[in-house]
């Protein structure tokens, strides 16, 4: 599962 890391 790929999710946009909150950077």
UniProtKB/Swiss-Prot annotation:
It comes from the Eukaryota. One of its GO terms (cellular component) is extracellular region. The keyword Iron does not apply. One of its GO terms (biological process) is regulation of blood pressure. Keywords: Hypotensive agent, Metalloenzyme inhibitor, Metalloprotease inhibitor, Protease inhibitor, Pyrrolidone carboxylic acid, Secreted, Toxin. The modification Pyrrolidone carboxylic acid is found at residue 1. One of its GO terms (molecular function) is toxin activity. Expressed by the venom gland. It is found in: Secreted. This peptide both inhibits the activity of the angiotensin-converting enzyme (ACE) and enhances the action of bradykinin by inhibiting the peptidases that inactivate it. It acts as an indirect hypotensive agent. This is Bradykinin-potentiating peptide 7b.
């Amino acid at each position: 599962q790929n999710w946009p890391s909150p950077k």
